[in-house]
Every structure is written in structure tokens, then in C-alpha cells.
Amino acid sequence: MQVSKYFTHQLSQFSGYPSIVSERDACGVGFIANLNSKPSNKIVTEALNALSCMEHRGGCGADNISGDGAGVTIQIPWDIFISEGINFLPKLQSNQSILNYGVRMILRSSDDLDKIKKIFSWALDEYQLDLISWRNVPVDKSILGEESKFNQPLVVQCIVRSNNLIDYKLDKHLYLVRKKIEKLVSKLDINTNKQFYICSFSSKTIVYKGMLRSEFLVKYYNDLSNSLYVSNFAMYHRRFSTNTMPKWSLAQPMRFMAHNGEINTLLGNLNWNKSKESLLKSSIWSDYYDILSPITNLENSDSANLDSVLELFIHSGRTPQEALMILIPEAYKNQPALSLFPEITDFYEYYSILQEPWDGPALVVFTDGKFVGATLDRNGLRPARYTITDDGFISLSSETGVSNINSQNVVTKGRLGPGQMLCVDLSKNLVLDNWMIKQQISQKFPYKEWVNKYQSNLNLLEYLNDFTFDKVQMNRWHTAFGYTNEDVELVIEHMASSAKEPTFSMGDDTPLPILSEKPHLIYDYFKQRFAQVTNPAIDPLRESLVMSLITYLGPKGNILEPTAIMAKSIKLESPIINENELAQLNSFNLSVVTVPTFIDKHLSTQTFVDKILEICSQCDSYISQGIEILVLSDRIEILPVDKIFVSPLLIVGAVHHYLIKKQLRHKVSLVIDTGQCWTTHHFALLIGYGASAICPYLAFLTVRQWWHNSRTQKLMSTGKLSRLTIQESQDNYRSAIEKGLLKILSKMGISLLSSYHGAQIFEILGLGQDVVDLAFSGTVSRLNGMTLNELYEDSLKSYNLAFITEIPKKLPNLGYVQYRPSAEYHVNNPEMSKTLHKAVRNNDNILYSKYKSLLNDRRPTNLRDLLELKTDRQPISIDQVEDVNSVLMRFCTGGMSLGALSRETHETLAIRMNRIGGKSNSGEGGEDSTRFKSIQDLDTSGVSRTFSHLKGLKINDLASSAIKQIASGRFGVTPEYLVNAKQLEIKIAQGAKPGEGGQLPGKKVSPYIAELRNCKPGVTLISPPPHHDIYSIEDLAQLIFDLHQINPDAQVSVKLVASLGIGTIAAGVAKGNADIIQISGHDGGTGASPLSSIKHAGAPWDVGLAEVHTTLVENSLREKVILRVDGGLRTGKDIIIAALMGAEEFGFGTVAMIATGCVMARVCHTNNCPVGVATQRQDLRNRFPGIPSDVVNFFIFVAEEVREILAELGYKSLEELIGLNDLFKVKDIELSKTKNLNLNILFNSINMNRNLIPKLKHKTVHTNGNVLDDILLSKSNIINAINLQSNIVQDIEILNTDRCVGARISGLITKMYGRDNFNGNLQLNFVGSAGQSFGAFISKGIHLYLKGEANDYVGKGMNGGEIIICPPIEQKTSSSNQVILGNTCLYGATGGYLFANGQAGERFAVRNSNGYSVVEGVGDHACEYMTGGLIVVLGTFGRNIGAGMTGGIAYFLDEDNTLKNKLNTEIVKAQRLLTKESEEQLKNIMELYEIKTKSEKAKLILDNWSQYLAKFYQIVPPSEQIQHLLMLIFFFSKYC
């Protein structure tokens, strides 16, 4: 057993963060095993070597020596113990005698060793175990870095013996002993408890781990370098933590598993687990309940908690494989292969009733000493490559090439696909594949029989047709439940007519609800959280096969002891039910009761809390009577004047948490029947806080009212609205909500509603702790805010408006969405915009002062508006302050794409920023190469021939954006684009719609835009929600590495959106070698976004920036990065406030657009911008009013204002102010809603000592160190070939640690010759295993030949040249059945050839623009979002082919007639080859492929062409179908 827990991590715990919302990590992970030989030291050394080969996937602290974590799980080193002469050793000569011994590995403080030993003795005596020996594990402290040395524990092993138990019975006993010891230690002083951790306690395995880098693990633990250490398997892990002061205990492996990824649903998993713990009282663990509980711990990481649950399953008699099938199930609903294994589907169906999945990207490697294996999440979001040899060696890891394997011995090279599993039975020396494992497990019980007998399905029933209210009555009900005119007309009616959420543009410029003087529902105080960096968002439309809204009603039984009756449930395809379906619940075999949620309006002696608790107690009583479904309802026949309903969100949260505390939650489902729920955000919150189903009766009634309205009927009759029945309109509304729910789930990376249910994935802005404790326990509310009483009084005011004598015939329009005079305040109001236009066009300081006053004197809108400045110095003369140019250099524009903006706007912004020494941001979509050179062709009238559409130009103006953005769609990202940047920005998220992708509507894709983006005109362009090469923090580090390779002179920035826990993410980004981190606020602008995202996702940059700066300072990382902020910056005062919070650079988006001429028409998404700013229509572009000098004037005004404030404060430069948040004080302002707002998080999160604030001396650009490309470029023959444009051939050995090979060479060539002007040829022949991003961003003239294999991201962004990959000549097995490439290859390619004689992984050719490729097999999601190029697949293929594919051609050889079942037909269609031109196209590229690769499969096809031609399908999107139709017409007209 090993023990460690030095918990001195310095991650800021802002306002009670539970660790689980701030701990995130990723890593490299794997296992090796040897089936056909005895345990050997070779396995130990091979595992340590493999671990070292994945060092680049791990992170390290600020000292660059302390690792985020590294470790191995191996067999117990009995031979080492024998050699040390421990007194029990004679008994270890027989293998049988070893079975009754266990070893505990402990990390702990040396100060309390005696106390710990006494506790051990007590526990061992109680459980009748003999203490054989204590052993201090020999370690070398000298190799530790400062951080790991400061936290170093004492590492101790405890060897014990049982006299009557062996094997698994002993391990179960040791589990109980460990839990008992942990309970006893927890009662000691807090420091002893926190510094104690048992790594492992087993008769089979032991864990060695710590805050170490890979190569230092073996140096630290002397045991690992001892030749006596033998094992026949090993599991290893290298951690990349975004918590920069990791704990020794959180290094991995855990006790049974090692995890690469992130569990997105953790809070919900823990809540449900806590609720179900009481079931242990009536199970095999009944005698040990008090010892085992709690199973999970809010303070532990996601991996540690998953390991704890897995451990319970294993000790309850499950194998790790079965347990992980239950906890991390595959997406079985849309898996064609499962048609052959219906029993596996039955298994998943049964357990989906009982267990919510632990959802998120996950490669989990596991062992219990008998089995070692791995499983992958349902989406296949982590790489997992394996190799099996003919002498029984097997290696599985995050990368291929980490083990020394002779190619001649290879039997199989494969990968785990989504939801797949592989394991080794160590006792039987068997390798078990995915279907073998699952088929065996699923036949354990008659699951199908159980489900068929006890599960019912809720059928979809007709909606109601009646509508009995007049307008006044309807308005009274709407008013009582908080509806406004916008809610009805912009939201509900839009959904009813279109089946879509409403879309708006330009972001949210209204006050935060807690600052607003207008009434807000409790829903509005919640912000949706979203995935960024540490896990990816999902596309709910193109990847719907992994998404599901299925939910189950009924009690949850003890999953550890499955029985038939536990299948008793009602299955709902959607959580949204209508009135008839709600009534139908009473007809099933579950007992249902309705609990009214109206309470007396006049509370008298009872408080509001008492009334809520009374309802909770009533629910408790019903459960004791056997009720299994509780319907919490505010439906009432007549609105009562003397009563008021409790908000459905408040009551469902209160009941949910009340029942969790009572350990009753698993016994009942909660259904909400409410009038106060109509937007997707409302539904998401109700489900997130415990509702299983919702009937929005008033929303349905509103739809019926709209449909019956004479105006609606007239619009339908005239064709201005689609003709709909009353049933269709209500179904549209439900459909829109369902789509919106899927989007909200997917932006967090969650696939299943059952995982989102109760997961509480929100942040609260403006509710007090008493509200949180009652109904939202575990949700972070950093600002405090409205109390329960204040909420009650607020809701009472709104409710009472329904009973005024003269109720208006029309609901009030409070202007929450669209600006209206006298309604909700909008910062970007007409007066502000017009004043700014006049100021910049006339260069008028007085008008700018008016503009400034309009903003500085406004009512509080943002949190920073509640702060004012103070100073510790005397004012100084402005002449002593840094000059205006120094300030201007810190300014930049937000990323706004050419496509969303007109060419005129985009180029004007770039020119003006270059004039002032600032930086413009290209946004996504590329740039015309003519912009990369300064303008020299002005005529006498100041008109440029190249830029004839622009006004106000000067000689030497430069239209190139200094910041070139790399977004998820990779549109326009070419080597030429990248090398012409001063900064390269990776856009992870956008403030107005974080966690979502984007679309450029086809009507905005003009021929010019299509040329820049390498696509076809008029075709809608889709940007995926995630970067498909960033699914984790180490993936981001890889992309940063790649960009530093292609352009070593450019800084790399990473754009994040403020949200809870952004500090830890930023810490990971800093360790990932980013130069700049940009924090965007939730109020950023957008060309188009769902209204619910604009209003309810993300957080203010104020809190995000404060958190990031504080976290980086605390962890000695602040000086490594520049911090930039954007989102709603408008004045010099904003700049000063942001600087005091830690920002060094400042981005302007919306206000820069206004200065350019934007009139805030908010129609960007329609292509109808009236002033030509955000349109591609030439007639409207001709109206563009802006000239560069307008925007220059604006920025000079702001910079001069900054200088004035600096002088008033007594500071000479912005540099002096950065991070000095003690210069803030809170304004004396009385808010209309509460006096309880706490702003401490903005200016003294760590009680900042000025001495802690680093002097920010940033290196110009971070480097990658010496890499293989540098070695190649140091060779004179290669440099000469580049300079002379000649030909060269060079042979090179390559390892998996050689990453992004070819990119730096490509960057140099492109910098020298441009896109297509290099006429030489560099042929580089590699042998070995290439690291990630092999051939990324290569250009014309570069030819990479690899004999071996490659990892993920091969050829991403390639623009020319060729990549040829073939297996080693000595490999005996057929190459067409072997995996030779990783995931996400050819991502965003804009040219060149990739030929691979083997199979590729998931998402092959994702967003391919113009790459040409032939491979012999692909995984799921091939050709996703493809817009051009040619792909040929000659082997097996996965699901969801061609999703979002709008251009290009693909040919698939369909030998088993499965293509049509695996094709996403939303856009593309599959057809046989219909024309001679198609056949020639396919044959030509196959002939070239066969010449280049010597592929046996290609030769076979070509030799039997007519036979195989009939088996090919052509995948054709609409843009290509037109072209092929024209070819067919020509063919038939000529030959028929």
C-alpha cells in the first residue's frame, strides 16, 4: 500500500469552488503486457520507456522540473522485498503463499507517522490481518523540482498477511480496511487528513506515482530501476493538469484505472451517487455501510471519483470491463454492428434505466491484477492505438511508436474506436476484443426479458386544440407567470412557425439581471457553462448519432445487485411532454401524485423558506407511501389573488436537494407541470436541477392562441407564413425546444440528457447563499446577491401586476432583446452610436467627451460599473505619462471574419490598426494575399488599383491583419496565411456563443469569399463547435507547437471565454506554451447566434480576467504570458479597469464596428446590412461610409483618455498599473434588487500583495526548443536546395517524439517564395514512427515519405506537396487491415496529396478543402464538413460519413454493402459512378496511389477493374451534384 497527500495546491478557491469545478487534466496513458512469458524486468523498463516517450503529452510546473504527475501500476515487487530480507520472505517462495499477502502504498507526512501506524494497527487487528512489515520506499529527493520538493510526502509501504483469505476475497477485505483507515484518519487534525493518501492496497498490484516528469519517475523511485523488479503487465500515465500546483495524490494511475480526458457530468454523477448510497444498506455491503459511505468526494478530481465508483463495482463482484460498460456506455442506439449482437443492446437498455453515464472524452486504461485493458468514450475523443505481436507482447497507448517492437513480429496494429474496449486476461493469457468482451458480459442476465416485462413507453399523443381565453385573460396569465411581449412574439411564436430557436446578432448589451432595474425571472441569474480546451463541444446536428434526449421515469434500484423489477420504468423519447401525455402517466404501473406549488401569498408567521420546506416534506411523505412519480404543478383553474406559485426552478431544486440529503432521491422521479417555462434555457435549468420531464402547459396554450389569432391565419393564407395545423405549430415549438436542449448539452460536450439530468452545469450570478443552499447546492455563486426574501418580494410584485383593474390588451415590451426607448437599457443605444459617429468623423474632442459621459454616467450594466478608482499617489502632469503611441500599441480589434464583414470593412479595420501600431484580427476565413504587401499603387487622386473599393488610403498603408485567426473551420488557413502573421490566434470560443460552431450562410459566400475559403460560391459553410485537433489541454499544446513550427516569429494567442474555472484552464494554456491568453466576455458581438446563447452563456470578462490573473500569479506563471481582454470595451476608463485587473492588451469589437460606420441594425445574419458593413451584397457594400481615419480618430481619443486617467492617478504608464487591483473601491450605489452583492472577487481574490505581482518581461515569442526540422535545416544540402530551388533526397530516422515534422521547412519556403513559386523538390525519406502533426502545413515542393506509421493530425493544413506512408517492408501482415494513421488527418487541408497504405482513424479529411487522398480504411465521421478535394477509401469505414459535407468528392469501396447505413444523408447522397469522367478520376488517382505505395489492395482492384468498379460509391454533396448533372446531360445528348 502506498500513501500520499500533500494538498498544497495554490489554485484559488473563488467563493467556495468545489475542487471538481477547478480540477481539469489530460495526459498520455497506456498499458503493456506479455502473454506468453513469465514476469520480467523488461516489462517494467518498457513501460517506463513508453512513459518517457509521451513526456510531451504531460505538463510541468513553473520550475520546468516538477511534473504535473507521472506513475505506473505494476505487480508487487516481491523479489525486491525478498532481497531486503524482510522476515516473512521464506513464505514467498511459493506462488500460492503470495496470494494471502497484500501491500499498501502510502503517501503521507512524516510528522505524524506514529499516529498513522497506530491507526493501521487498530484497523488490521479489527479485520484480523497480520502486520508483517513497514517499509520506507527508497527515493532520490535530489531530482525533485522546487514545487514537487515542497510538497513531497513520505512514501511508505505496509505489508500485511491474512491467514484465511486469498485473491479477490482478500482484496475485498483490504478495500474495507483501507476505507476504515481513511475514516479514522479523517477524524484527526485537518493537516494530517489532507496529507494522507493510500495509493493502492492490493494483493496483486501496486502504484508508484508522484509530481514528477516521466523520465524522473524511475530516478525518484529506486525500486523501478532495480533489475529484480518483475511484472507481466504495466499501466502508465503522464498527466497534464490545468491546476498548476498538482497534488501528489492526483497523479495517476489511480487504484484501478488511469484516465485521459474529462468527465463533464461529474457534479450530477456525484449527486446521484450520493442519493443511491443508501441502497448499500440493503445489499452485500449492509454491514459496512458506515465504513464505505461516502463512496465519492466532492473534493476529489473526476478521475479519482470515477475510480472510486469503479472500485466499488469491482469489489462487488464485477469485472472492470462490465463496470465500465455500465459507467461509460457506447452510443449503442445508432451502431449498425450491434444488429449482430442484440443481447449487448439489451444490456445497455437495462442499465440506462439505472445509471446515468459518466460522460465526456475518456480513454480509460484499467487493471485489477487479473485483467488489464482499455475502453474509449462514446464519441472516440481520445486516441488509443495498439500493437500485438506473435510472441505475445501487447501495447496500447495514446500514441503509437512508444514501445520497441520488431516489425517482423507484428500481428495486428489497430485502434480503439468510439465506445470500444480491448483487454487482456492475464490469468488465461488471452486478448479479448470488443465484441467478445461485451457479448460475454451481456449474457449474464436475461436483460431483454426484464426490460420487456417491466418497462413501458410513453406514446406521443395529440396536442390540445382548444383555446378558451380572450386576450385580456391570456395577458393576465402571461403577466402572472412573467412573460413579456418579446417572449411571446420573438421566442414562442418564432418557434411555433419555424421549429427553430430565434437567431440574433451583435451580442448582449443589457445590464446583468442583478444590476437591472427591470424584473427578471430566477432563470436569468444562471449562466450556462460550456466546453473549452479541456474537452470538446459536440455538433448536435451532424453528430446526432451519439446524442439522445431519452429519459426514464421511475425509481432506481441497487445497480450492484441487478434484478428484473429494477427495469420498472416509463421511457420517454423527449423530456418535453404535452398535457395529454402528462395525463397518460397515470395509466402505467408506476404510482403518480400531483403536488401543488401554489402557496399563500400572505406568509404571516411562516417564512417563504418554511413554505418551500413544507412542500419538500410533503414529497417525503408521498415517497414513504410508495409514490414513484411526483408531479410538481402550478396549474390551476383560476388564478388566485391570495396565492402565488413557487418558481418551478426554485421548487424543483429544493425538492431535489432535500431528497438527496434524505437519501430518497433515487426512489422517485420529478415531473414539472408549469406555466413558467418557455425558452430552451428554462428547460435546461429545470432538467439540470432534477426534473425528468416538463409539461409547459402555458407555452403550449400560447402557441394555440397564436395559431387561432386572425392575423396568423391571414399570414398563412397569403403565404407569408407556412401553412400549419394547430398540431404542427405545437409540434414545431416542441421540436425547437428539443433542438435547443441538444445544443445546450452539446456545448458542454455532453451527449445524453440522462447525463445532463441533475448535473447542475451552470454558474450563478447574483443569488445569495441561502438560495443556493436551499435549491442549488454545489452550484457556485461568486457574487452572492438576492436573498430568498428578496426573490419572494420581487416575484410578488410581478405576480400582483396580473390583478390590476385595467390589464393591458398587449403585454409590455421591456426591451430585453431589442432596444426600445424607456425599456431596458442598452449600452449600444442610438444616442451613443450617433454621438460616436459624429465624434470620429469630425475628429471632435467635445463630442467624444459627450460620448464618454454617456457611457461613464450610465446606470450600472456590468460589474465593473460598480467600481471606482482610488490612488496612492499625487496627480502628475500628462506630459510625464507615456505617449499616445505606446498606449495604441496595446489595442487590437476582435476577430471578425471576411465573409461576416464586407471586404471594405475588413480591410479598412486592418489598415487603420496598422497605421496606429495596433493589431487587427482577421477572424476566421483567410485573407487575400494581395493584402500581405503595403499599398504602393495610389494615383494622384489617392485611389489604388488593387484596392479601388477603398477610400482615404495613403502610400505604405498595409491591409494585412497582424493577428491571423485559426478557428475550428480552418477556412483560409494556408502556409502563406500563417507566415504572414505577427500573431496567430487560436479561437477556442466566442463570447456571444461559446461552445458552438458557426455558419456562414450561402448567400454571404460570394465568389470572392469562396475563393479565399477554398469552397464553392453560394454554399453554406459550417465551422464545427470544436477544433477537431483540440479535445484536451495536451492537444491544444500540440497546436500551439505546430503554429510555432510554421511561423517561429509569430506569437501564439489562445482566445477563451470567461466562465467558472477559467483560471485553471488559463494555467494549462500557459503551460502549453502560449504567448498570449485572451479573455472574452459574454457580451461580445456576433454575426449570428441563438438568442439563448447570447443571453445565457458565458460570464463577464471582469470575473474571468480577475480569476485568470490571480491564478497565474499564485502559480508563478503570470510572467509567461500576455493577458488580453475583450468584450464591451468602449472607453479609456474601461482600459484602466481592465489593466488593474491584470490585462496588458485590449480588444475592441462592437465599438470599432460602430466607429467604422455600423448603425447597430442587428441584421448581420441576414446579409442585409443597410450600410455595407456586414454584407456581401455589392449594392449595399457601395454604401459603406467608413474610411481608415475614422477609426484611427476613435483609438486616439481612447488612448488620450487613458493618459489623462493615468495622470490623475499619478502613474506614468499602463505597465505600472497592471494587476494593482487594490486601486479599486466599491461605489456607493444602491441597487434596486439587493444590497448583498459581493465584488471581492474583482479586486482582492488573493489579498494581493504587490510584491507578488511579477514584473512582466515577456519573451518576444516562445520557442519549441531544438526539433527535427531544425536539425534538417542545419544541413547545408537542404538549405542549398531551398535557396537554389533544386532537388534533394535525404534519409532520416523518426520517433514519435518528433512532432510536426515538415512545418518549419514549409514555413521557410513559403516565406521566401510565397504560395506557389518554389520550384525545387525536397524528398525526405523517414523510417520509424512519426509523432503528431506529421506533414502539417507543408507546401509545394515538399515530399515526405514514411516507412512506418504515424500518429494523429497527419497532413493537417497541408497546402501542397505529398505525404506517402507505407508499412515497413519486413511487416508480414496485410497492410490494408492495419492502422497506419491516427485521428483527424488531412484536417483543413487546402492542397497536396496524402497516400497511406493502411487504415486511418476517426474524422479523416474533416474540413478538407482541397486535399487529395487515398487510404485503405477510416473510422467514424470521415469527410465531415468537407468543402473540396478528393478522397478515396479502399477498406472498412465507420459511421456518419459525409456529415456536413458541402463540397468535394469521395469514393468508397463498399465490399460488404454497409455504406448506406453509415452515410449521413442530411446533405450528401451516395450514387454509383455514373459518368466516364468519374471513372477516370477514380482510376487516375488509384493508379498514382499504387505507384507511390505499392499497395497490394490497389493493385488487386486495378487488375480487376470492372469487377471492383461496381462496388464503388461516389459521395456527392449538392454543390457537386449540379456539376455531375450537367456532365450527364452532355453525355446523353452526345451518345444517346
Swiss-Prot record:
Presence of keyword Nucleotide-binding? no
Tell me the disulfide pairings in this chain. none
Paste the cofactor note. Binds 1 [3Fe-4S] cluster.
One example of a Gene Ontology biological process annotation: ammonia assimilation cycle
- Please give the cofactor(s) recorded in the UniProt entry for this protein: [3Fe-4S] cluster; FAD; FMN
| Reaction(s) the record says it catalyses | 2 oxidized [2Fe-2S]-[ferredoxin] + 2 L-glutamate = L-glutamine + 2 reduced [2Fe-2S]-[ferredoxin] + 2-oxoglutarate + 2 H(+)
| Compartments, as annotated in UniProt | Plastid, Chloroplast stroma
EC number(s) on record?
A: 1.4.7.1
Q: Does the keyword Membrane apply?
A: no
Residue ranges of coiled coil: none
Q: Which terms are listed as keywords in the entry?
A: 3Fe-4S, Amino-acid biosynthesis, Chloroplast, FAD, Flavoprotein, FMN, Glutamate biosynthesis, Glutamine amidotransferase, Iron, Iron-sulfur, Metal-binding, Oxidoreductase, Plastid
Q: Which InterPro entries match?
A: Aldolase_TIM, ET-N_metabolism_enzyme, GATase_2_dom, Glu_synth_asu_C, Glu_synth_asu_C_sf, Glu_synth_centr_N, Glu_synthdom, Ntn_hydrolases_N
Can you tell me which residues bind [3Fe-4S] cluster? Answer: C1158, C1164, C1169
Fetch the CDD domains from UniProt. gltB_C, GltS, GltS_FMN
GO cellular component terms, A-Z: chloroplast stroma
What's an example of a GO molecular-function annotation for this chain?
glutamate synthase (ferredoxin) activity
Show the active-site residues. Answer: C27
Q: Which residues are involved in binding FMN?
A: 1105-1162
Pathway assignment reads: Amino-acid biosynthesis; L-glutamate biosynthesis via GLT pathway; L-glutamate from 2-oxoglutarate and L-glutamine (ferredoxin route): step 1/1; Energy metabolism; nitrogen metabolism
What family does the Swiss-Prot or TrEMBL record give for this protein?
Belongs to the glutamate synthase family.
What PANTHER family does the annotation carry? FAD NADPH DEHYDROGENASE/OXIDOREDUCTASE (PTHR11938), GLUTAMATE SYNTHASE (NADH) (PTHR11938:SF133)
- Describe, as the record does, how this protein assembles with itself and its partners: Monomer.
* NCBIfam families assigned to the protein according to its UniProt record, in alphabetical order: PRK11750.1
Tell me the protein's name. Answer: Ferredoxin-dependent glutamate synthase
Origin species: Antithamnion sp.
